[in-house]
Amino acid sequence: MVSKAKPLMSSDVKSILMSKRANIYFLEHCRVLVNGGRVEYVTDAGKRQLYWNIPIANTSSILLGTGTSLTQAAMRELAKAGVLVGFCGGGGTPLFSAVEMDVEVAWLSPQSEYRSTEYLQAWVRFWFNDKLRLAAAKQLQLQRLNWLPAQWTSRTLRDAGFAVPMDTVQALATQFKSNVANAPDITTLLTDEARLTKALYKLAVQTCGYGDFARAKGGSGTDAANRFLDHGNYLAYGLGATATWVLGLPHGLAVLHGKTRRGGLVFDAADLVKDAIIVPQAFVSAMRGDDEQQFRRQCIEALTRSEALDFIIDQLKAIAIDTARLAQLTETAPGAIKNIALATAFGTEESA
C-alpha cells in the first residue's frame, strides 16, 4: 500500500537558518514557476526549454531583472521557504517607473509579520532621538571599517592578483575611524563615507592597474568596473533586505541614509559589506574580462565565504541592543553620558 505524500508545510523548508543560506539569485529573461513540486526557472534555447532548479531551502533572496515572470504558485513556495523576492532592472540596475524615478529594488517580504519584535522594540527605543540615531550610525560605520581590512587582504583576492598590503588598508581604515568618531552629525558622516569610498576606488585602481576611472551612478557607467559595481551592489542589497526581514526591522527606519528615504535601512545594512566584498571583486573581474555571470558567481562565492549575511545580522542586532541600552541609561540618568555618539563608537561609557 502506497501512502499519500504529506503536503509541504512552511516549517519543512526553513530548516536552514537564514544567516547560513548559501544562495543568492539574480535572474533575467526567464520564467519562475513550480514544476513537479519544485521551484524552477525556465530559459529558452531555440525551440527547447531548459529547466533549472532553485534550492529554495538554501536560498536567502532572489532578484528578478528584465524579462522575468513569476507564477503565483512559485511565489507561494518561495514565501513558505522565507525567500525574499526583489524586482530590479537589467544587470542589477535601478527600476524606473512613471511615478518614482529612482526605485532601487521593490521587495516582496516572504511571509506574515508574525516575527519576534525584540529587535524592533530596541530599534524604535532609540530611533526618535537624533543623538542616539547618530550613535547607531557611527557604530555601523565603525564595524564596516573593522571588517574591511581582512576582506581586502584575503587569500582569494591575492591569488586573483589583487595584492594590497595589510598596512595600507589598515591605515586607511584607522584614518576614517577617527573621522567617524568625531563626526558631529549625519551629514558629516555621509561626507566621510563618500570620501572613504572614493579612497577605496583609488586604491583598487592602483592595485589592479585599471587606468582612468570615475564612478558613474544609477547604471549610467559604460566601462566594466562601473557595470560590475552596480550589479554587485544589488546583491549586497539582497543581503541587507534579508537581514532586516530576519530581525523584523522595517526598511524605513534608517540610521544613515535618511529618515524619509524609502528602504534606507536596506542601504545601511548593505554598506556593511559593499566596500569590503563588491569593490575589489568588481575591479578584479573587470581586469580579467569576466562577463556578468562570472562576476556574479565570484561575488556570491565571496559573500558566502566571508559569511557576509551573518555579519550584517550580528551587527544590526548589536546596534539595536547597545543603542537601546544607551537610551535607557539617558532616560534614567540624564547627563550620565557626556558624548553619547563617541561612547557608542568606542564601546565605552563616559560619565559626566
Regions found by a protein language model. Give the residues of each.
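A positional/architectural concept
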Residues: 7, 14-16, 32-63, 71
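Glycine/small-residue-rich interface belts in oligomeric ring/scaffold proteins
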Residues: 52-120
